[in-house]
Amino acid sequence: MTDTPDPAAVLSPAVKAAILSEALPYIRRFHGKTIVVKYGGNAMTEERLQRSFAHDVVLLKLVGLNPVVVHGGGPQIDDALRRLGKQGTFVQGMRVTDAETMEVVEWVLGGQVQQDIVMMINEAGGKAVGLTGKDGMLLQARKKLMADKEKPGELLDIGLVGDVTRVEPAVVKALQDDQFIPVISPIGYGEDGTAYNINADVVAGKIAEVLGAEKLLMMTNTPGVLDKSGKLLRSLSAQTIDELFADGTISGGMLPKISSALDAAKNGVPSVHVVDGRVPHCLLLELLTDQGVGTMISAH
């Protein structure tokens, strides 16, 4: 399939100059600040969107922001499992992870996917370095047990799925100080060395909290958070989110995403947004323009 042209390619020089002028106050505001980006969805699988993402990240670094990328890789994991004759299973948006699946997760996320992202950013002119939770003890974790919605009071064991117990930010800060762009795979490690599969949205939220990030951007395959009629909700408060959870408007993979976004907002991240990763240059649109894209999550 032929890639659709980048919309920026058809803009006149005058329009491009106006866009750059609009970005200036935002560049000043965010200069030196950490921006955590959860990278996933179509933006990881379509070549045109991959290029625009890499260019956005490099540009943000060049103008003085400190981007940190936390990536997913669900479709790539599913493809690898299918080749082994396995079918992915999910509970409340979390992948059930047995030992064989965990080996696949480590290989796909910590190897193939991470290396592709690092190479893509480097080819765009940046300096990216890949990390997993094991590097510098970045992500310490324990086994996650989930509440059974069918049997109140009981817990579900979904295998080698983890909760983050501690984030050690030293290795990320050291890379930032040396002008590198960290690219983090969401694999945590227990005290006994057991590897855990951790939802990338959860990891992005925890990383943003510990690094004192100015913004957390979560890329998705929708315009943002939608109501039951499919209309974009531009902003969500904690109370509204609770209502959307209760009536089933937010479900599936959106559950951990919005829960993590809300936790990050409650724990001090000033600005949390769910953005449409299908839009080329969505990071620049959200960070450096008046309009922005997606849904803003507020703790209040």
Curated annotation (Swiss-Prot):
Question: Which keywords does the record carry?
Answer: Amino-acid biosynthesis, Arginine biosynthesis, ATP-binding, Cytoplasm, Kinase, Nucleotide-binding, Transferase
For substrate, which residues are the binding ones?
A: G73, G74, R95, N197
The kind of enzyme this is, by top-level EC class, is: transferase
Q: Where is this site: Transition state stabilizer?
A: K38, K257
* Residues in coiled coil: none
In short, the EC number is 2.7.2.8
Example of a GO cellular component annotation carried by this entry: cytoplasm
**GO MF, any single term:** ATP binding
Q: In which pathway does it act?
A: Amino-acid biosynthesis; L-arginine biosynthesis; N(2)-acetyl-L-ornithine from L-glutamate: step 2/4
Entry's Gene Ontology BP terms: arginine biosynthetic process via ornithine; L-arginine biosynthetic process
Tell me where it resides. Answer: Cytoplasm
Q: Does the keyword Ligase apply?
A: no
Q: Quote the CDD domains the UniProt record gives.
A: AAK_NAGK-C
Q: Which Pfam families match?
A: AA_kinase
Q: What catalytic activity does the UniProt entry give for this protein?
A: N-acetyl-L-glutamate + ATP = N-acetyl-L-glutamyl 5-phosphate + ADP
Its biological purpose is as follows: Catalyzes the ATP-dependent phosphorylation of N-acetyl-L-glutamate.
According to its UniProt record, which protein family does this protein belong to?
Belongs to the acetylglutamate kinase family. ArgB subfamily.
- What HAMAP family does this protein's entry cite? ArgB
Q: What is this protein called?
A: Acetylglutamate kinase
Say which species the protein is native to. Bordetella avium (strain 197N)
